[in-house]
């Protein structure tokens, strides 16, 4: 086991201030679910990975219920490259043929998920990994991608799905038994096929079904940026629509912001996009007053 975080260099008065600042937030979120979409640099840099594992353990210890939905795009790209296959994206979604789907299942449900679970358990937490196929968690249907150049037409991007329904029973059972669920965004369809679902979309739908107090989406940028590179700290639904229209929000940010906005409109009380490159970004956002990232509002 690794040594615990060394707080010996922090002055006692500062420690007290940190704890005092966190107290009202611990009260607010105690017993509530917080869904975290985990991805980007936070999943690949060892220092950030360890910090994230410790963060979610601390949340659980103070009575908050973190639920992790992870991505794994870079790891999938690496695995595809090893077999001589290039990744293709349309409107931020990975084109997923049968061979790619096999790689996605192996990478997300195996390598990536187990790395997260083992690290949390290594630092003293109790994490359990599952995919959307376990316990009937995520029912999926094939995603029909609208062709923007041909209205009324759709693009076939293979075994890419969208969430048809979520059965949260297995997640709630794990929470009740003091486990931290770690979920790979793979669903199953009525046609018997597995479907690759964007992790942002799964996180948003899961937060809604769990009636989560907060949805936190980690990125490799400070938050939502305007065209001049300035951070937008607070966005309403109307402002987001305008950013979609003028192309400010594009590529991989499209499903992320769409999912965040849908969650806010569906009753998730607090939705934030945060910079996962900052160590302990999860704790900073949830347990401090520090303005951080971009808040998404439904009105």
UniProtKB/Swiss-Prot annotation:
InterPro entries: AceGlu_kinase-like_sf (IPR036393), AcgluKinase_fam (IPR004662), ArgB (IPR037528), Asp/Glu/Uridylate_kinase (IPR001048), NAGK-C (IPR041727)
GO cellular component: cytoplasm
Organism listed in the record: Burkholderia cenocepacia (strain ATCC BAA-245 / DSM 16553 / LMG 16656 / NCTC 13227 / J2315 / CF5610)
Gene for this chain: argB
Enzyme Commission no: 2.7.2.8
Family: Belongs to the acetylglutamate kinase family. ArgB subfamily.
Biological or metabolic pathway of the protein: Amino-acid biosynthesis; L-arginine biosynthesis; N(2)-acetyl-L-ornithine from L-glutamate: step 2/4
Gene3D superfamilies found in the cross-reference section: Acetylglutamate kinase-like
Name under which the protein is recorded: Acetylglutamate kinase
UniProt keywords, alphabetically: Amino-acid biosynthesis, Arginine biosynthesis, ATP-binding, Cytoplasm, Kinase, Nucleotide-binding, Transferase
Primary location class: cytoplasm
